[in-house]
């Protein structure tokens, strides 16, 4: 699990 990838996904979702 990549926290950076998840964080980037959340930012992109915004």
Swiss-Prot record:
Protein species of origin: Anterhynchium flavomarginatum micado (Solitary wasp)
Post-translational modification as stated in the protein's UniProt record: C-terminal amidation is important for the stabilization of the secondary structure in alpha-helical conformation and for activity. The non-amidated analog eumenin mastoparan AF1 (EMP-AF1) has a lower level of alpha helical structure than the amidated peptide, as well as a reduced antimicrobial potency on both Gram-positive and Gram-negative bacteria. In addition, this non-amidated analog shows a reduced mast cell degranulating activity and is devoid of hemolytic activity.
Compartments, as annotated in UniProt: Secreted; Target cell membrane
Residue numbers carrying Leucine amide: 14
Any one Gene Ontology BP term: defense response to bacterium
Tissue specificity: Expressed by the venom gland.
Organism phylogeny: Eukaryota, Metazoa, Ecdysozoa, Arthropoda, Hexapoda
Gene Ontology terms, MF aspect: toxin activity
Keywords (A to Z) from UniProt: Amidation, Antibiotic, Antimicrobial, G-protein coupled receptor impairing toxin, Immunity, Innate immunity, Mast cell degranulation, Membrane, Neurotoxin, Postsynaptic neurotoxin, Secreted, Target cell membrane, Target membrane, Toxin
Family: Belongs to the MCD family. Mastoparan subfamily.
Record protein name field: Eumenine mastoparan-AF
UniProt GO cellular component terms: extracellular region; host cell postsynaptic membrane; membrane; other organism cell membrane
Keyword NADP included in the entry's annotation: no
Major localization listed first in the record, in broad terms: secreted
Entry function: Antimicrobial and mast cell degranulating peptide. Shows broad-spectrum antimicrobial activity against the Gram-positive bacteria S.aureus ATCC 6538 (MIC=5 ug/ml), S.saprophyticus CS (MIC=5 ug/ml), S.epidermidis CS (MIC=5 ug/ml), B.subtilis CCT 2471 (MIC=40 ug/ml), and the Gram-negative bacteria E.coli CCT 1371 (MIC=20 ug/ml), E.coli ATCC 25922 (MIC=50 ug/ml), and P.aeruginosa ATCC 15442 (MIC=20 ug/ml). Also permeates anionic liposomes. Has little hemolytic activity. Blocks the lobster neuromuscular transmission. Induces the depolarization of the muscle membrane.
């Amino acid at each position: 699990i990549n926290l950076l990838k998840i964080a980037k996904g959340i930012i992109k979702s915004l």
